[in-house]
Amino acid sequence: MRLSLAKCAIGSSAVLLACLPATAPAHAQVTRTSQYAPITWELGYRDAELQVMTDAQRQGMDRNEENAFRAFYNQKDNPDKKIQLGQAFLQKYPKSPLAELVDARLVNAYMAKQDWKNVYASADGALALKPDDVDVLATLGWLIPHVYQADDPNGSAELDKAERCEEHAMEVMARMPKPVGVSDAEFAAVKTQKSTQAHSALGLVYYRREDYAKSATELEAVMQGNTNPDTTDLYVLGVDLLKLQRFQEAADAFNRCAQPGSALEDICKRNADAVKGQAARSK
């Protein structure tokens, strides 16, 4: 399913009829402007695959299994090939100690293909094996509200799932000890990035539910100390603030999201101008 931006309508001189597109920008657009997707490296240590492989080797992992995983791990540029190698590995070695990592990394490959059904299936497979995988929790919880369809009969349940994922991700991060070999600064930076992603996702979940006050609270947390926030976060925050009749703040958010080259540049510019007029009339 290929997603595209829907157009937002603007009232002539009345209240702005701003809307987040019913579907978010296509994944190719999202990844150009988003700080969050895809999964980068396992929270807790770098090169998680190699670390787990070393542990598996100590347990006497079969050489063929090791080679199959290395082929999957080393495939960086071709998502179709990575999917093929990953699925072949899972079919042949379903009980492998490396299975969770394969599922987790298949999430990225399926995201590149905009194959949301298999993104969800791979994420669910990874979380069944490792419920505290922060990377998968944060990524799944972030993706769900971005590809949400208002007419999906399972939409409400999916938003509930996204909320649970992000809340659990933050719970895990709060109790996670700093791993050996990672500096305090590095660990703090990754935790901050994941926490920001979680608040971003929750902001969009609450927006989809039309709970604009809670959405604004989450997205304002995202903006704190953030010099280069995600443009979709800024857009949604602008709509939240508009709905809450905080017009000048809404205009500021729309101005910030009108970054050159952004998929939301034109919409944000138009909305900023319209809301400025509304702010002036409300004084």
Question: What do the predicted segments below correspond to?
Answer:
Residues 72-76, 110-114, 141-155, 210, ...:
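Short coil/turn linking the two alpha-helices of tandem helical-hairpin repeats
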Residues 92-99, 128-134, 174-193, 224-230, ...:
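Short solvent-exposed coil/turn linkers within tandem alpha-helical repeat scaffolds
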Residues 68-71, 106, 140, 202, ...:
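Structural register within alpha-helical repeat arrays
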Residues 108, 142, 146-149, 204, ...:
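Residue-level recognition of tetratricopeptide repeat
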Residues 33-36, 179-180, 192-208, 217, ...:
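Terminal, low-structured helical/coil segments at or just beyond the last alpha-helical repeat
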